[in-house]
From Swiss-Prot:
The modification Phosphoserine is found at residues 21, 219. This is Universal stress protein PHOS32. Residues 1-43 form a transit peptide. Residues 1-45 are annotated as: Disordered. Phosphorylated by MAPK3 and MAPK6 after pathogenic elicitation (e.g. bacterial flg22, Phytophthora infestans zoospores and xylanase). ATP binds at residues 19, 83, 168-178, 186-188.
Length: 242
């Protein structure tokens, strides 16, 4: 599928950055850090910039739809933020692909190239953006690469100046139970306690929860009380900002 098709955003709205991994304090900004304000973007001039962190999963798709239905308001702009790991190729459809597979099994199918994975990632994130496009919300797609997904996500959220960030998860710690380091779960837990802006975690409803999603809201930050008012139909868990 071509991300440039009419059902997807134009390619200039999709940027995959390959910057060196920042190993510095959240309060230190390097002059070499690329600026999202260098050129006009679809989010310029928005009253609020709402981030939705996505990992190409069904949970992320649900989080985007929830944000459209319950959180995003006229005048807002949305940034779909994806951090792609550098050490392992990971995709919702491909699954984790350790680099040692071909060494262990010479008969294994050739692994996708980095270019293939970049194209796959851009297409999948563009698919996630469809609800935003359908309702006319301005948005852009921001993709970066780093081996430390949790820290990089928090750094990008701060650098982009987001008013709030929404992400999907089946529950904190779900990632650890599955033994994967690529999906939101403990990532969302880390963001709840380290991001500089309010964080809303929408847990994909399962058989235990019933049809109503569980929404976890990080306390702190000034976000006009939007979370409580907008998602009154969902069960809430509140976490104090440490």
């Amino acid at each position: 599928m071509n991300p440039a098709d009419s059902d997807h955003p134009q390619l200039p709205n999709i940027k995959i950055h390959h910057p060196p991994s920042p190993r510095h304090s959240h309060h230190h900004h390097s002059s070499s850090t690329p600026s999202s304000a260098a050129t006009p973007t679809p989010t310029a001039g928005a009253r609020r910039k709402i981030g939705v962190a996505v990992d190409l999963s069904e949970e992320s798709s649900f989080a985007v739809r929830w944000a459209v239905d319950h959180y995003i308001r006229p005048g807002d702009a949305v940034v779909l933020l994806h951090v792609s790991p550098t050490s392992v190729l990971f995709g919702a459809d491909w699954g984790p692909l350790p680099l040692k597979t071909q060494i262990e099994d010479p008969n294994a199918q050739p692994q996708p190239s980095q270019e293939d994975f970049d194209a796959f990632t851009s297409t999948k994130v563009a698919d996630l953006a469809k609800p935003l496009k359908e309702l006319g919300f301005p948005y852009k797609i921001h993709i970066v690469k780093d081996h430390d997904m949790r820290e990089r996500l928090c750094l990008e959220i701060e650098r982009l100046g987001l008013s709030a960030v929404i992400m999907g998860s089946r529950g904190f710690g779900a990632e650890k139970k599955r033994g994967s380091d690529g999906k939101l779960g403990s990532v969302s837990d880390y963001c709840v306690h380290h991001c500089v802006c309010p964080v809303v975690v929408v847990r994909y409803p399962d058989d235990r929860d019933g049809p109503v999603p569980i929404v976890t809201v990080k306390s702190g930050g000034d976000d006009d009380g939007d979370v409580v008012a907008a998602s009154a139909s969902a069960h809430h868990e509140h976490i104090k900002d440490e």
